[in-house]
From Swiss-Prot:
It comes from Mus musculus. This is NF-kappa-B inhibitor alpha. Gene3D superfamilies: Ankyrin repeat-containing domain. Residues 15-40 have a biased composition (Basic and acidic residues). The modification Phosphoserine is found at residues 32, 36, 283, 288, 293. One of its GO terms (cellular component) is nucleus.
Length: 314
């Protein structure tokens, strides 16, 4: 499996999160499919494809044998062409299978479609071709991420632009509302990783700036406070974030500033927050808040890339 490349974050903290991160990196070491097919077998598939020049009326699409071949990871020939970044070959395959939605949207063992892999490998041109050929941008991988979730997580503005401009308005509306299996929308992921341009772009497209995580009710503004990102706080306020929206435990973004180092964030929110949502309950102390801000795996940044079970240093 391909994993998004790491993006070092200033907000990374030591402590319990380190243990979570190590466990997550171990769990995420999946085979990418690169080593599951021998070079000779891959070259033979390439040769067979290049020899195919039949018109649709001469043979149905399903009759082409290379479409039926899968690796042990469930990768199709199109998956492999994208993984290996064989762009001319990938475009040729897409051209031949245009309209064959079952093949274009086929998901490997990790539930990744060719569109997911185009985003992971940072090939926005391929992603655009796949969308125009009929790929479904709403399909999710094994973590519940759509391709747009991955693009926001990686901070690839070019892929975000392709995915939001090429899909239909109906698809776009659904994807912007969709949450992955950690309860995060695309806006949440862009906020967590501090990609301000993507945050602003998503809100402009109609993303709900006050969307709450299903598990604890944090909004993007709560996340910005948790991650101590004053620039993100400013942007979210500019985009209409509700400073008085509380989590399911009743905490406003301002209340999360207690015990945090950024006085700038506290000043920003203090001017706008209702008085009764500024002080912590008398029965609470600053340490009791720790249960509110447990980090999910989405908030632990990728810092490695795994190919065939081997970690690469970027």
């Amino acid at each position: 499996m391909f994993q998004p490349a790491g993006h070092g974050q200033d907000w990374a903290m030591e402590g319990p999160r380190d243990g979570l991160k190590k466990e997550r990196l171990v769990d995420d070491r999946h085979d990418s499919g690169l080593d599951s097919m021998k070079d000779e077998e891959y070259e033979q598939m390439v040769k067979e494809l290049r020899e195919i020049r039949l018109q649709p009326q001469e043979a149905p699409l399903a009759a082409e044998p290379w479409k039926q071949q899968l690796t042990e990871d469930g990768d199709s020939f199109l998956h492999l062409a994208i993984i290996h970044e064989e762009k001319p070959l990938t475009m040729e395959v897409i051209g031949q299978v245009k309209g064959d939605l079952a093949f274009l949207n086929f998901q490997n063992n990790l539930q990744q479609t060719p569109l997911h892999l185009a985003v992971i490998t940072n090939q926005p041109g391929i992603a655009e071709a796949l969308l125009k050929a009929g790929c479904d941008p709403e399909l999710r991988d094994f973590r519940g991420n759509t391709p747009l979730h991955l693009a926001c997580e990686q901070g690839c503005l070019a892929s975000v632009a392709v995915l939001t401009q090429t899909c239909t308005p109906q698809h776009l509306h659904s994807v912007l509302q969709a949450t992955n299996y950690n309860g995060h929308t695309c806006l949440h992921l862009a906020s967590i990783h501090g990609y301000l341009a993507i945050v602003e772009h998503l809100v402009t497209l109609g993303a709900d700036v006050n969307a709450q995580e299903p598990c604890n009710g944090r909004t993007a503004l709560h996340l910005a406070v948790d991650l101590q990102n004053p620039d993100l706080v400013s942007l979210l306020l500019k985009c209409g974030a509700d400073v008085n929206r509380v989590t399911y435990q009743g905490y406003s973004p301002y209340q999360l500033t207690w015990g945090r180092p950024s006085t700038r964030i506290q000043q920003q929110l203090g001017q706008l927050t209702l008085e009764n949502l500024q002080m912590l309950p008398e029965s609470e102390d600053e340490e009791s808040y720790d249960t509110e801000s447990e980090f999910t795996e989405d908030e632990l940044p990728y810092d490695d890339c795994v190919f065939g079970g081997q970690r690469l240093t970027l």
